[in-house]
Amino acid sequence: MLDPKFLRNELEITAERLATRGFILDVDNLTKLEEKRKSLQVATEDLQASRNAISKSIGQAKARGEDTSSIMAQVGDLGAQLDSKKAELAELLQQINSIAMSVPNLPDESAPVGADENDNVEVRRWGTPKVFDFEVKDHIDLGEALEGLDFKNAVKISGSRFIIMRGQIARLNRALGQFMLDLHTTEHGYTETYVPLLVNEESLLGTGQLPKFGEDLFHTKPATEEGQGLSLIPTAEVPLTNYVRDMIVDETELPMKMTALTPCFRSEAGSYGRDTRGVIRLHQFDKVELVQIAHPDHSMQALEDITSHAEKVLQLLNLPYRTMVLCTGDMGFGSSKTFDIEVWLPAQNTYREISSCSNMKDFQARRMQARYRSKADNKPALLHTLNGSGLAVGRTLVAVIENYQNQDGTITVPEALRPYMGGLSLIG
């Protein structure tokens, strides 16, 4: 969430910056609420001061042998008024906080201003798409012909947007995840982390999935008097980032770099009719997540680093891609700046997103109360959090199948993956 003080003191500037991402801040309503908050705050403080002063006079009156019943009654009356004002103030603050929790992050000044994905800006391109001398097939036809992708039985078992993988295609999928983990842990300095796949509501609030995006989650256990509800993770960003929730990290420990390979679960509530065939958009998919917990002074460089780490996977697999910086109107709810990496898919004759790398700055940290202790003044301050896909395994599988297809329907195994495939060089 945004800094409440900044939101109050710079309301017009905040509204202007949020408007660039298509979010209309109700300035009039917030102004009225803030005026009411100030009035209640002053009234509460005045009542508290009056009660304290009169309470102090009780002892003095008793020392003089005077009757204190009227003073005691006055203190009781002030106490009741004070309790009422405190309750009213608490309710108002909860209302303001609820609004603040629904406000997206401020875009970084370096993010291009735009309305939607058409205004995203390409920053670099790597590799040249292969020119095939035969008619290319998509991953669905190739995978089904190899008996490696089974959509029919997945629908029978679970419904649409699920997949069963078998044989060498399943092995290739597993190899991709292992390859990514090994690269990030041995070359890029991330610590491999095993995380829960079920998380509580506080964790989802911390990273910003709640309250705004609850419909995209699979809720497995409702909240009860005995405890919070549990939901399947939409991304390992949630448990990895929440690792530092309610913590004060020593500045010398920064940056903290964590990675995890997990299944991810999304209802895709807003994706009706999009990518209904194939492995591009599933309810359950594997992803290697990269998370960095960084010093505020270094988080923009960390964003460049995390993006390059995701790009390295595609370079080693020799898969052509382009990197886009998202415009303000296309960024995610909690992001201040985002790079999307798009891989070339020959069957679609276009680039498709395979990774999204974002700097959340202190947006998540404020929700989580994740802080570091500064060496300069020994005081706690909010951390910056970053995350990125390194990569989405299923989409990488699609890219490998399509880019490495042969005329006879076989798939050449990329050299970087052969050690993970027992030396196998050809599928089919």
UniProtKB/Swiss-Prot annotation:
Read off the PROSITE patterns from this record: AA_TRNA_LIGASE_II
InterPro entries listed in its UniProt record: aa-tRNA-synt_IIb (IPR002314), aa-tRNA-synth_II (IPR006195), aa-tRNA-synth_II/BPL/LPL (IPR045864), Ser-tRNA-ligase_type_1 (IPR002317), Ser-tRNA-synth_1_N (IPR015866), SerRS_1_N_sf (IPR042103), SerRS_core (IPR033729), tRNA-bd_arm (IPR010978)
According to UniProt, this protein's pathway is:
Aminoacyl-tRNA biosynthesis; selenocysteinyl-tRNA(Sec) biosynthesis; L-seryl-tRNA(Sec) from L-serine and tRNA(Sec): step 1/1
Its GO CC terms are: cytoplasm
What's the superkingdom here?
A: Bacteria
Binding, L-serine: 235-237, 289, 389
Q: What biological process terms from GO does the record include?
A: selenocysteine biosynthetic process; seryl-tRNA aminoacylation
Q: Please state the protein's primary subcellular location.
A: cytoplasm
| Residues that, per the record, bind ATP | 266-268, 353-356
Which keywords does the record carry?
Aminoacyl-tRNA synthetase, ATP-binding, Cytoplasm, Ligase, Nucleotide-binding, Protein biosynthesis
Molecular function, one GO term: ATP binding
The compartments listed are: Cytoplasm
CDD domains noted in UniProt: SerRS_core
The reactions it catalyses are:
tRNA(Ser) + L-serine + ATP = L-seryl-tRNA(Ser) + AMP + diphosphate + H(+); tRNA(Sec) + L-serine + ATP = L-seryl-tRNA(Sec) + AMP + diphosphate + H(+)
* Catalytic activity, EC: 6.1.1.11
Q: Give the domain section of the comments.
A: Consists of two distinct domains, a catalytic core and a N-terminal extension that is involved in tRNA binding.
- Subunit organization: Homodimer. The tRNA molecule binds across the dimer.
Q: Give the protein family.
A: Belongs to the class-II aminoacyl-tRNA synthetase family. Type-1 seryl-tRNA synthetase subfamily.
Biological function = Catalyzes the attachment of serine to tRNA(Ser). Is also able to aminoacylate tRNA(Sec) with serine, to form the misacylated tRNA L-seryl-tRNA(Sec), which will be further converted into selenocysteinyl-tRNA(Sec).
Q: What is this protein called?
A: Serine--tRNA ligase
Whichever gene encodes this chain, its name is serS
